[in-house]
Amino acid sequence: MAKVIGIDLGTTNSCVAVMDGKDAKVIENAEGARTTPSMVAFSDDGERLVGQPAKRQAVTNPTNTLFAVKRLIGRRYEDPTVEKDKHLVPFSIVKGDNGDAWVEANGKGYSPAQISAMILQKMKETAESYLGEKVEKAVITVPAYFNDAQRQATKDAGKIAGLEVLRIINEPTAAALAYGLDKKDGKTIAVYDLGGGTFDISILEIGDGVFEVKSTNGDTFLGGEDFDMRLVEYLVAEFKKDNGIDLKNDKLALQRLKEAAEKAKIELSSSQQTEINLPFITADASGPKHLTLKLTRAKLESLVDDLVQRTIAPCKAALKDAGVTAAEIDEVVLVGGMSRMPKVQEVVKQLFGKEPHKGVNPDEVVALGAAIQAGVLQGDVKDVLLLDVTPLSLGIETLGGVFTRLIERNTTIPTKKSQTFSTAEDNQQAVTIRVSQGEREMAADNKLLGQFDLVGLPPSPRGVPQIEVTFDIDANGIVQVSAKDKGTGKEQQIRIQASGGLSDADIEKMVKDAESHAAEDKKRRETVEAKNQAESLIHSTEKSLKDYGDKVSEADRTAISDAIAALKSSTEATEADAEDIKAKTQTLMEVSMKLGQAIYEAQQAEGGAAADASAEGGDNVVDADYEEIKDDDRKKSA
C-alpha cells in the first residue's frame, strides 16, 4: 500500500515525515536538511527555485523571491493585515481576479495556494526520493485558528501539487499527537505554538490513545516574521539617524536587513549580545555606507515585548473556554521556532506557573504528528482517537445584520447543526443566506465565508415559509451547507462558494500548470545533466587531441574537431535541448574512438618500453637479507 505522508506546511520552514514501522520519521531533503525554507523564487530566465536554492539567491533577487506566503492564503486583498504586509515585503502583493491577495513575480500573478503547492511539491519529491515510490496522499497541517477560507485554500494547494489531502489537521493537535502517543496516564496539556507567521494555543486532554481538544485560540498574523520586521524597522531607523539615508525603499537593502535580523534573533536566543555587520549596504555622493551595530538580548526583548504579550490574551481565553485554570495544566508543550526565545519561555512560565516542556523538537514535532495522523488514517497506527474542535463560531446574518450563531467555537468536529429560518417580507420567493465565521456580534465584522440564494419559494405571507438550514463541519474543519424548504419538501444541497477562493476551473488550470512545470523542471534537469556530460567529454577529448592528435590521420582530427564544435554550439545555445546535446555527444564519442584506440596503443608501447628497461636493469637488483620473527617473539619485544 502506498504511503501517506505528513506535511507541516510552515510560514518560514516546511517539514515532511512518514511512519517508519511504529515510529514517525522526518525525511531529509535533497540538500540534506530536515526542514525546507518555505520560499519560491523565479529567475530572469524563468527557472523556478524552491527551498534552500531560493533562499540562497534572495538578496540578489528580492522582488522575485516569495516568502511567508502562508500569511496571505485565503485572505482578501483589502484585509487590513494584508495592507500591513504590502509595505514590509520586497515582492509585490496584488489583487487577484477573485479579489483575493495574490503575489507577483516576473510580472506574473500567482495565488498563495499556487506558491504553497510548489513548496508541497518539493515535500512530495523529498518523500518520493526517500521511499522510492510515488506519493499521492498526504495529511497537511494548518494553524488551529485558520478559518474555512484558509483551510480550503490549503486543501486546494495540495490538489494543485498533485496530492489527495486526506485530512487537514491543526498544528497544535499534531504536536500533541507526537508528544503524547506513548503517554498512558491522563494529562491536561497546553500546546503553545509560536511559529514563523501564526500563533496558536490549544488545551487538550490526552491519555491512553485519546486526544481530545478542549479549546483553541490564536492569532493568524503573529509570528517570527513580525519579530524580524520589528528588528528591521529598528535597523532602518538607526541607520537613518546615523547616516541620514532611509533604506525603506531599497528592496535589496531590505532583503539583506531581513536576513541579518533573522540571524541576530536566532543568535540572541543563546547569547547575550551579537553584532550585525552589513558592509556596502548603500551608497551616497560621499561613497559607500556600511551598517555595523551591536545588539543585546535586552534590546531585542524591548523591541518585541508587545508581540510576546499579544500571546497572553489568547492563552487566557483558551483556558476559560476549556473550563480549566493555569494551575490545572499538567504540561505546557512548546512548538514553533519562536518558542526558543528566552523571553517567550519566561512569559509562558509566568502565565502557567511552571517550566515549559522542551523535550520535543519545535521545528519537527508538527510534521511528526501529521505522519502519525496519516498512519491512523492508513490503519498502521491503532487505538488512537483524535477529537478536534472548530476554532471559530459559525452562523448566518439575520434581520438587522445580526450574527446568529449556529455552531459555537470549540465545538468538537465533525459536527452538524440545523436551524429553521423564514422570510422577512410577504410573497418573498427567494432568500439570501450569508454564512460567516467569527466571534463579533454583527455579521459584517466577521469573516464572510460565502452566500447562496434559495429560490423558488411559493408566495406566502412573511414568517410562514419554513426553511431548514443545516451546517456541516467535517473533520478538516471545512464547512458545507444544505437547505430544505419544509413546505414543499424540496431539498437542496449547497456548496458554499467562498466570496474569494479558487473556483474548480482555477484549480484545474493550476493543476495543469503545476504538471507542466514539473515536466519543465524535469526537462531542465535532463538538459543540465546532458550539458555536464557533454562538457566533460569535450574537455577530455580536447586534451587527448592535443597530446595524441599526431597519432591519428588528419581526416580523423578534422572529424573530431568538427564534432567538438557542433557539441559546443549545442551546449551554449540559449534554448539548449537535452536530446540534441545527447545526440551530438554520441557523435563525438563515435568519431573519437580512433583517437582512443591510438592513445591505448601509444600507452601500450610506452608500457612495453618501460618493461624492457626494467629487465635490462635486473642484474643490478640486490637481494635483501631478512630474518623471520614469530608472533610470540614480536609480542615479547613490544
Swiss-Prot record:
Disulfide bonds: none annotated. GO terms for molecular function: ATP binding; ATP-dependent protein folding chaperone; unfolded protein binding. The modification Phosphothreonine is found at residue 198. Residues 604-638 are annotated as: Disordered. CDD domains: ASKHA_NBD_HSP70_HSPA9 (cd11733). Pfam families: HSP70. Induction: By stress conditions e.g. heat shock. Keywords: ATP-binding, Chaperone, Nucleotide-binding, Phosphoprotein, Stress response. SUPFAM superfamilies: Actin-like ATPase domain, Heat shock protein 70kD (HSP70), C-terminal subdomain, Heat shock protein 70kD (HSP70), peptide-binding domain. It comes from the Bacteria. Acts as a chaperone. Belongs to the heat shock protein 70 family. This is Chaperone protein DnaK. The lineage of its organism: Bacteria, Pseudomonadati, Pseudomonadota, Alphaproteobacteria, Hyphomicrobiales. The gene is dnaK.
